[in-house]
């Protein structure tokens, strides 16, 4: 192409060849005249000469010359335009080097050049290329003709079939439609009954055996009861037995109430006429009267806010209420005193262990799919004397609708309640479970309140003891009045309103903006006609906007236009709409139906029914004897009913044929296939043709009755259909049933055709169809009685064919049956054809992973995969139930071929690889479960005195127990034993079986070797398939270890994943950032088991309700002084603390009033505010609160102290401040002083040994008297947060194609728009090369096209479903308001970068960095990030900038007074910098000498310890801190177990993946001020290089040590990692390992016992036992201080007697430091800056670390291999399937696969199950074009896997691309009780963070101290309220 430039620029000459109309460039040449020219050469094929065209840039050709060129045929010259300039032509000029020939008929000069001969090779290459191009075009033409022919043929067939069908149905009328529906649904009903036969059989069996089983086992248990409480304590009984009454036991139904006249009445009779009156009185009265029914009702909403129809469950009895429902208001008489009425009798609710007796409505609902959850879930109980009613949250109704249950807000018309008015917005209601794209009926219900009923709206409150006064209550105004008042009220000056312009607006403003759209256009460029035309369009648009459904229709149109699973080249909107509509109907409705087993079996049932009908109707056919013509049949005697039946069956056949034609991939092949021809013949087309050929005016001919026997042949393929539908049947049964059906099909087909050809034969009495069926049986069995022989030639030929067929048929089928009975199965399913669209999987894929992959595809990417072909060496039989569950619940066709390793040879799978869409090579991630070598059990002894040189202690193959069992019956001679050898042999046997011997000599049970072997086999398969496919097919490789990572990447594999490395990388990040692995895994998983969820929530609430009743019974017992022998005390010291105040839980030691002396001065109000807790129970268990009381080893250090946030990502142990907290700096000083004060407030004699151990225990008693009202708060919070969690669990991560209207949008604006308008989280972008950039806030969408990037970038988005993603991609219009807002943001960005380029000098290059410049210029980073700002960097920022920052955030500062303290501390840090610089040299010299002495003493001490795989083996926790750990300020990480690949975990803990180069430079400067660092000393730098990068001191507690290999050497971690030998199942070993002092605890799924058993289930059981042992240890020491002291005295004997143990471990010298320490503690806080300077200086001089500070709430992570073990943790998880039959087992496997993810233990992110990573394969691009690669996980956790060249880096720099990672930060207290979207926009604009989740702490039971659970809420809704101490998961903004 020409490159036209301006005249000022000279363009270089480009030598181009013109061949076949295409140009190719050559090297540039310069004309001798000096002018730049462009030269083009064209080959004239006729004359074999060159035609050289010259053009000069500065000259133009006249229009006449252009015309002459066009006339002479040289119009192929390409003209290029640049930025819409006028078209320019180049004037041709000669060259002096060439001989010019002038053509008389042309203006072009033909040139003959001598250099042309040298270019013949190049020209020949061009000719070949031209030939190949011609072949491609020819192939395209052939393909176009073929598609056109197939389309026309299909269209002709469809028209012909439909026309013939309509023609035959004209005689029957519209009633035939009813018959068709009856036949279709009747056959489907029969097929459903057949498919569910095992289920119905089980129901019938249980009906007859249920009563006998109950009576049989009723004596073995006592039922659990729930007491219905009443106010009269004297009538209440604590007896477990039901009181003896004549009435039968009441159930969970509506109980009858006793009114004043003691007459019973029914609720249903009296509630309807009094419902509205009762509700109006309920709102007018301040108190409620009467007694409340004991009803299990979920809608425990607030009595002030429940709807009118909910009053059905709340009956208010009054003396003025008569039976007719007349309610008299006696408020003036009654006053404020409630009326006492007689309470009804106590009712007991029994829960049997095998039955749950409930009311009839719930019993019926169990049979149905849905039932009213509102009346069976939660409870209304009166718990106190003041008639305090426990009310549940309104949001339970939201959960009820999500479970597809009827809402209580809509009743039938007989209830006479008007429907609710729907409002578009309600700030108190959370978002729905439905799609957030458009509001549908459920979402409107969630977001609305009634105006007519005057339902009060109140925010969700915390405890009734709330003294904060921050609750939003609205008790005097209805919602409509409040909403009207809010509209008139002036909006608050929020801190983000100046930045955020994307807010919801009224429709009137939108219409006004639309009317004013064209007022700002340039009227000079438009004529009057266009103006009028635009005005008319504007009027039309405004008219359309008034139509309510216009926007919905418009959105639906855009949705279907963009609903193209395959890209389309057409741009016609109507064609795209119809194509999208057909595809949507195909994939959402018809395809689901066509693949359903019910539909497939229904087709076979209709064929069988037609067989019966044919046998009935054929008997009425008559024909003259010996007249064998087909048209001679007389059908007058056939009943008229048969005509309707025949028409019905023909229409059903037409539908089957058209469905098959529509869904076939190769339609031409389908049309001419055997079975489709049979279907076509039996359609009405044959009747239409026969009627046309043989017209009979006398009677009607039913041609379908003549051709009907051919349809019986459809039963031939019934076996394959039944094998896919009745998958619970064995192969032998399927083959037997298939043989029977095939025989019947051949029999009835042969008999029917013979009847049409030969009947009737009166002489031999073969007249009826059954006679010929008898003849068919005789013929097929080859008996040949001779009573009948065919007469016609056609009959004779058919008989011979049937005889030959039966010979071959019987032998082949019997052989196949024998093989199935006696040979293993190697194929399961139907092998896909080469034309099918399938995905090929190779390798020993475990059945569980296959199930996860298919379920992930079905839930996240429905209809994206048609079939899966699996080649596996594992036995096919183990996939039986998984195969059945996949076929039954998805539309995926699956075929499994395997049973041996030879099935995966490249020669066998060659064809399968070539025709596959994508290839997945997977290894066996569950090798321990499916490998026989790991099932061996070896016994070991406790003797560890092993000597490898002793031959008697070596294990030989014959010494292994397993080998002895195998060789038991061999011919080997038995060993003769002597009496003298008994002792020695016994001793040798013990030594042979000890643990170390097994670890050193046995390779059989080494899991690392097994995984390594599997990886090697996987690599071989990859190499073989790579050579077959030649990288043309995308290949995904999954390995366990990362040994062969470089080899795979060098072979250009499409996707690569190492399961073990990814698992340990997630764990390493989660250690620093709580719960991050669970947050990320939620993005790749979408559970859909609503039934299991419902059951789980019901069971959870029943359990909690049981605790409520127990608590109330305990109160009554204490009040009535009744003693019970079975009363369980919660703790040993319960009686001592029974009357203690709840404030004792808030303050660490409430008895010491000295704690409050430090809260003086200006900080008094602030500290009191931070000590406040909305629920007093929280604080005892929360180590992440703002006033954290845990005395960890890092309590006095700024770096380790993350107040209000467990932001352990930034564990930099230098003296800089908290990274993200608003008020963390002032809390830091407060907490440090308070904690150090706690440590010494009772230490009158500090040198006593017991104080260092006992001072942190204090009053840890877990028992306290908790008010009953707190139970309501817990139930309410759990229900609400489970709802929020399940709502966020719907979000998946997808690849997002940006719509055209978003081109030019700033990424930050686009993410804000998508979240606010559509509820989606846009978190990053991804390129075609899989380069991922998270939170690139300065990236402009579509800007890469300006830099000639070939393909546009895609977005990474979190949304609810694939349909919602398509809706977002189909957005066609964005309001002008948003566009203007986006343009304003872009202009600000450009100005900012312009300023940055001017001031690039003078700041050591840091002003070039984007993040630093934004902090200085735009003040986005305020003083809240003091912790990440270095001391030297603080000095650069001037006081003027700090004052500007302070003024900008004054709105938050007014609400949170911690900012005032932050500014003072900021100044203090500025002063400290100058002081530090003065004393720097003196400190360095002092530190050098101290550090050298430390190294010498450490080397002497390490001689005493063993060296195991690079680290030292120590005795206990104290020895490790004294002799091993370099930096003793780091927190402790305890790792239980030592697997083979633990080096992966330590590697990711060591690598500083969370900091950029900027932070590394800061750390070097900060480390220069550290007392242990000396930059001038080489020994110091080398010795501490690895330790500085590790954030923890690590202790590995294990009884086993893996064998050495070249990867697991831990020498790099020897300075901060120690090893303690011992089993983690022993509590003594755990205490030695420092279990009480560990900040983080990881229990790995390795072997923890003496038995070398690698069985996965046993290892998981050990992990569960260790977890419970740890919990029990903490419970014991929290009960009493003495227990803790006794444990310490017993285990740490020497250390306990050492009275200076802390000083000896941490410091080099003496007691002088203690004086400074005491002086520091005695100071109190004042507002004077001088005292603050003293405080900081004293803190920096000496900080005492107590290594025996007990960490009350360590974060524990347990690794579990198999999810089946979770049943022992949470009994509601049902993962055992052995007690079910085959059909139920398949259903249970599918329903429970991965559904454990919503349980409490998983929500708390305490358990990591390896199965969570199984479905990552389903999230890759070959699966769907909307899939995102799972490599995004590495980007989320901060590991940059992108490798860029210099050019690519420059390209990214030009685009302002940046990437970030996930961090956890505290949420400012300003947002407490405010919606989440406010916090989201604040973090987005002010901090440049993208919030994607919330970490929340919830107490699940107030009766236990250790009951706090974490809630990981991913993708929160807009209206979710922020609570205290919530932390946010954000994607931080970093530059590349």
Curated annotation (Swiss-Prot):
Residues 772-788 dip into the membrane without crossing it. Gene3D superfamilies: 1.10.287.70, Voltage-gated potassium channels. Chain C. GO terms for molecular function: potassium channel activity. It is a multi-pass membrane protein. It catalyses: K(+)(in) = K(+)(out). Pfam families: Ion_trans_2, Slo-like_RCK. This is Potassium channel K1. Likely a predominant potassium channel in the erythrocytic stages of parasites. Mediates transmembrane potassium transport. Required for the development of oocysts in the mosquito midgut.
């Amino acid at each position: 192409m020409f490159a036209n430039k301006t005249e000022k620029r000279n363009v270089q000459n480009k030598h181009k060849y013109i061949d076949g109309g295409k140009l190719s460039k050559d090297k540039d040449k310069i004309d001798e005249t000096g002018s730049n020219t462009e030269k083009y050469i064209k080959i004239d094929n006729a004359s074999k000469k060159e035609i050289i065209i010259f053009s000069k840039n500065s000259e133009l050709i006249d229009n006449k010359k252009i015309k002459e060129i066009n006339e002479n045929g040289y119009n192929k010259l390409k003209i290029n335009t640049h930025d819409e300039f006028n078209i320019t032509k180049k004037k041709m000029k000669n060259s002096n080097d060439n001989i010019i020939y002038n053509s008389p008929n042309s203006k072009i000069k033909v040139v003959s050049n001598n250099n042309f001969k040298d270019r013949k090779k190049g020209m020949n290459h061009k000719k070949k290329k031209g030939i190949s191009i011609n072949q491609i075009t020819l192939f395209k033409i052939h393909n176009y003709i073929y598609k056109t022919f197939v389309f026309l043929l299909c269209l002709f067939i469809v028209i012909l079939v439909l026309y013939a069908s309509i023609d035959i149905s004209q005689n029957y009328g519209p009633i035939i439609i009813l018959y068709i529906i009856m036949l279709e649904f009747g056959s489907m009903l029969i097929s459903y009954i057949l498919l569910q036969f095992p289920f119905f059989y089980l129901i019938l069996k249980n009906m007859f055996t249920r009563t006998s089983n109950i009576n049989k086992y009723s004596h073995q248990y006592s039922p659990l009861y729930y007491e219905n409480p009443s106010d009269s304590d004297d009538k209440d009984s604590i007896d477990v037995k039901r009181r003896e009454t004549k009435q039968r036991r009441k159930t969970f139904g509506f109980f009858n109430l006793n009114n004043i006249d003691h007459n019973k009445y029914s609720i249903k009779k009296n509630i309807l006429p009094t419902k509205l009156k009762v509700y109006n009185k309920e709102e007018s009265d301040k108190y409620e009267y009467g007694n409340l029914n004991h009803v299990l009702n979920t809608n425990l909403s607030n009595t002030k806010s429940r709807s009118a129809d909910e009053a059905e469950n709340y009956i208010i009895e009054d003396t003025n209420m008569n039976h007719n429902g007349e309610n008299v208001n006696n408020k003036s008489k009654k006053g404020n005193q409630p009326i006492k009425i007689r309470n009804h009798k106590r009712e007991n609710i029994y829960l049997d262990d095998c039955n749950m007796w409930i009311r009839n409505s719930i019993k019926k609902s169990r049979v149905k799919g849905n039932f009213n959850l509102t009346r069976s879930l939660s409870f209304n109980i009166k718990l106190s004397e003041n008639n305090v009613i426990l009310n549940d949250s309104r949001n339970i109704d939201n959960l009820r609708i999500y479970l597809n249950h009827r809402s209580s807000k809509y009743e039938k018309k007989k209830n006479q309640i008007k429907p609710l008015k729907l409002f578009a917005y309600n700030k108190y209601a959370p978002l729905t479970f439905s799609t957030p794209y458009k509001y549908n009926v459920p979402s409107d219900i969630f977001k609305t309140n009634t105006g007519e009923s005057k339902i009060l709206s109140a925010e969700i409150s915390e405890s009734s003891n709330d003294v904060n006064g921050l609750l939003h209550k609205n008790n005097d105004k209805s919602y409509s009045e409040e909403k009207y008042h809010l509209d008139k009220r002036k909006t608050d000056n929020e801190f983000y309103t100046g930045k955020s312009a994307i807010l919801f607006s009224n429709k009137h403003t939108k219409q006004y903006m639309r009317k004013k759209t064209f007022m700002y256009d340039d009227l000079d460029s438009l004529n009057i006609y266009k103006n009028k035309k635009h005005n008319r369009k504007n009027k039309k648009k405004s008219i359309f906007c008034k139509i309510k459904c216009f926007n919905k229709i418009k959105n639906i149109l855009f949705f279907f236009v963009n609903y193209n699973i395959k890209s389309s080249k057409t741009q016609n909107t109507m064609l795209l709409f119809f194509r999208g509509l057909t595809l949507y109907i195909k994939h959402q409705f018809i395809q689901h139906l066509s693949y359903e087993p019910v539909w497939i079996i229904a087709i076979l049932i209709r064929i069988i029914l037609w067989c019966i009908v044919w046998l009935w109707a054929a008997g009425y056919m008559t024909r003259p004897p010996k007249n064998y013509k087909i048209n001679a049949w007389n059908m007058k005697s056939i009943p008229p009913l048969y005509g309707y039946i025949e028409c019905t069956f023909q229409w059903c056949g037409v539908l089957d044929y058209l469905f098959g034609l529509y869904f076939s991939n190769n339609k031409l092949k389908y049309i001419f296939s055997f079975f489709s021809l049979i279907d076509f013949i039996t359609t009405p087309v044959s009747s239409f043709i026969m009627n046309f050929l043989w017209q009979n005016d006398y009677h009607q001919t039913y041609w379908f009755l003549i051709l009907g026997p051919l349809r019986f042949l459809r039963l031939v393929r019934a076996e394959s259909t039944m094998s896919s539908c009745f998958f619970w049947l064995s192969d032998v049964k399927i083959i037997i049933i298939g043989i029977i059906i095939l025989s019947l099909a051949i029999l009835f087909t042969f008999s029917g055709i013979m009847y049409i050809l030969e009947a009737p034969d009166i002489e031999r009495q073969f007249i009826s169809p059954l006679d010929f069926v008898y003849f068919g049986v005789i013929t097929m069995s080859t008996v040949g009685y001779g009573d009948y022989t065919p007469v016609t030639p056609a009959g004779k030929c058919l008989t011979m064919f049937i005889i030959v067929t039966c010979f071959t048929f019987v032998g082949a089928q019997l052989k196949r049956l024998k093989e199935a009975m006696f040979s293993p199965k190697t194929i399961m399913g139907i092998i896909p054809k080469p034309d099918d669209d399938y995905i090929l999987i190779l390798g020993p894929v475990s059945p569980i992973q296959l199930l996860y992959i298919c379920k992930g595809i079905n839930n996240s990417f429905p209809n994206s995969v048609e079939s899966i072909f699996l080649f596996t060496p594992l036995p096919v039989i183990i996939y039986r139930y998984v195969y059945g569950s996949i076929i039954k619940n998805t539309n995926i066709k699956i075929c499994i071929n395997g049973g041996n390793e030879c099935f995966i040879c490249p020669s066998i799978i060659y064809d399968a690889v070539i025709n596959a869409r994508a290839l997945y090579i997977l290894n066996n991630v569950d090798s321990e479960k499916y490998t026989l070598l790991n099932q061996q059990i070896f016994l070991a002894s406790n003797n560890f005195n092993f000597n490898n040189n002793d031959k008697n202690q070596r294990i030989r193959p014959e010494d292994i127990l397993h080998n002895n069992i195998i060789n038991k019956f061999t011919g080997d001679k038995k060993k003769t034993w002597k009496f003298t050898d008994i002792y020695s042999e016994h001793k040798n046997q013990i030594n042979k079986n000890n643990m170390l011997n097994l670890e050193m000599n046995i390779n059989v049970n080494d899991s690392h070797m097994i995984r390594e072997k599997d990886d090697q086999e996987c690599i071989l398969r990859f190499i073989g398939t790579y050579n077959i496919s030649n990288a043309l097919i995308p290949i995904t490789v999954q390995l366990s270890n990362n040994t062969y990572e470089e080899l795979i990447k060098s072979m250009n594999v499409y996707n690569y994943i190492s399961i073990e490395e990814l698992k340990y990388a997630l764990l390493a990040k989660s250690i620093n950032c709580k719960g991050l692995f669970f947050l990320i895994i939620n993005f790749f998983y979408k559970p859909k088991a609503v039934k299991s969820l419902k059951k789980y929530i019901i069971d959870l609430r029943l359990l909690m309700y049981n605790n409520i009743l127990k608590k109330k019974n305990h109160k009554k017992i204490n009040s009535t002084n009744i003693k019970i022998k079975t009363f369980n005390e919660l703790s040993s010291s319960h009686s001592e603390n029974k009357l203690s105040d709840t404030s004792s839980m808030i303050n660490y030691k409430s008895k010491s009033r000295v704690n409050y002396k430090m809260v003086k001065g200006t900080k008094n109000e602030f500290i009191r505010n931070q000590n406040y807790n909305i629920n007093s129970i929280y604080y005892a268990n929360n180590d992440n609160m703002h006033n954290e009381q845990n005395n960890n080893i890092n309590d006095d250090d700024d770096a380790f102290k993350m107040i209000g946030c467990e932001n352990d990502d930034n564990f930099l142990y230098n003296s800089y401040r908290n990274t993200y907290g608003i008020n963390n700096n002032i809390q830091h000083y407060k907490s440090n002083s308070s904690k150090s004060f706690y440590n010494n407030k009772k230490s009158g004699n500090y040198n006593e040994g017991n104080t260092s151990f006992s001072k942190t225990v204090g009053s840890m008693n877990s028992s306290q008297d908790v008010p009953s009202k707190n139970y309501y708060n817990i139930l309410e919070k759990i229900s609400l947060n489970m709802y929020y969690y399940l709502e966020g669990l719907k979000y998946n991560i997808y690849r997002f194609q940006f719509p055209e209207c978003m081109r030019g949008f700033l990424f930050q604006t686009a993410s804000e728009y998508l979240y606010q308008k559509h509820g989606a989280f846009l978190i990053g972008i991804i390129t075609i090369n899989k380069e991922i950039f998270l939170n690139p806030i300065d990236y402009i969408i579509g800007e890469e096209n300006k830099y000639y990037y070939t393909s546009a970038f895609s977005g990474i988005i979190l949304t609810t479903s694939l349909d919602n993603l398509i809706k977002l991609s189909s957005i066609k219009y964005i309001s002008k308001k948003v566009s203007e807002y986006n343009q304003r943001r872009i202009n600000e960005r450009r100005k900012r970068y312009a300023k940055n380029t001017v001031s690039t000098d003078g700041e050591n290059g840091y002003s070039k960095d984007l993040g630093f410049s934004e902090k200085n210029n735009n003040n986005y980073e305020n003083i809240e990030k003091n912790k990440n700002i270095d001391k030297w960097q603080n000095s650069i920022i001037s006081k003027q900038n700090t004052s500007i920052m302070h003024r900008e955030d004054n709105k938050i500062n007014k609400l949170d007074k911690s900012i005032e303290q932050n500014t003072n501390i900021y100044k203090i840090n500025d002063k400290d910098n100058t002081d530090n610089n003065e004393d720097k040299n003196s400190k360095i010299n002092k530190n050098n000498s101290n550090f050298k002495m430390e190294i010498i003493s450490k080397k002497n001490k390490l001689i005493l310890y063993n060296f195991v795989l690079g680290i030292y083996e120590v005795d206990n926790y104290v020895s490790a801190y004294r002799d091993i750990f370099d930096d003793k300020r780091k927190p402790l990480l305890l790792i239980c177990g030592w697997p083979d690949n633990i080096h992966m975990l330590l590697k990711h803990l060591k690598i500083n993946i969370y900091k950029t180069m900027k932070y590394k430079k800061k750390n070097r400067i900060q480390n220069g001020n550290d007392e242990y660092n000396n930059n001038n000393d080489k020994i110091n730098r080398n010795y501490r290089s690895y330790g500085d990068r590790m954030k923890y001191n690590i202790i590995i507690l294990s009884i086993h040590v893996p064998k050495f290999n070249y990867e697991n050497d831990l020498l790099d971690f020897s300075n901060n990692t120690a090893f303690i030998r011992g089993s983690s199942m022993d509590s003594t070993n755990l205490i030695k390992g420092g279990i009480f002092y560990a900040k983080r605890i990881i229990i790995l799924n390795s072997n923890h016992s003496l038995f070398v058993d690698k069985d996965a289930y046993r290892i998981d059981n050990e992990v569960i036992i260790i977890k419970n042992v740890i919990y029990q240890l903490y419970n014991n020491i929290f009960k009493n201080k003495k227990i803790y002291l006794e444990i310490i005295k017993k285990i740490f004997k020497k250390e306990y007697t050492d009275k200076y143990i802390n000083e000896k471990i941490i410091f080099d010298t003496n007691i002088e430091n203690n004086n400074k320490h005491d002086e520091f503690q005695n100071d109190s806080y004042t507002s004077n800056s001088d005292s603050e300077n003293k405080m900081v200086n004293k803190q920096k001089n000496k900080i005492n670390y107590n290594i025996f500070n007990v960490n009350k709430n360590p974060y524990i992570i347990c690794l579990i291999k198999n999810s089946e073990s979770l049943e022992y943790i949470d009994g509601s998880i049902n993962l055992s399937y052995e007690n079910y039959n085959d059909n139920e087992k398949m259903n249970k496997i599918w329903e429970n696969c991965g559904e454990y993810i919503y349980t409490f233990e998983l929500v708390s992110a305490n358990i990591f199950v390896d199965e969570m990573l199984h479905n990552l394969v389903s999230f890759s691009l070959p699966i769907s074009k909307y899939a995102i690669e799972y490599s995004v996980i590495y980007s989320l956790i901060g590991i940059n896997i992108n490798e860029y060249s210099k050019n690519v880096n420059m390209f990214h720099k030009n685009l302002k691309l940046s990437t970030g990672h996930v961090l956890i930060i505290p949420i400012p207290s300003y947002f407490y009780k405010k919606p989440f979207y406010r916090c989201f926009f604040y973090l987005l604009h002010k901090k440049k963070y993208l919030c994607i989740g919330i970490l929340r702490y919830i107490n699940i039971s107030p009766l236990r101290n250790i009951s706090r659970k974490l809630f990981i809420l991913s993708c929160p809704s807009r209206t979710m309220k922020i609570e205290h101490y919530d932390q946010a998961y954000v994607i931080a903004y970093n530059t590349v």
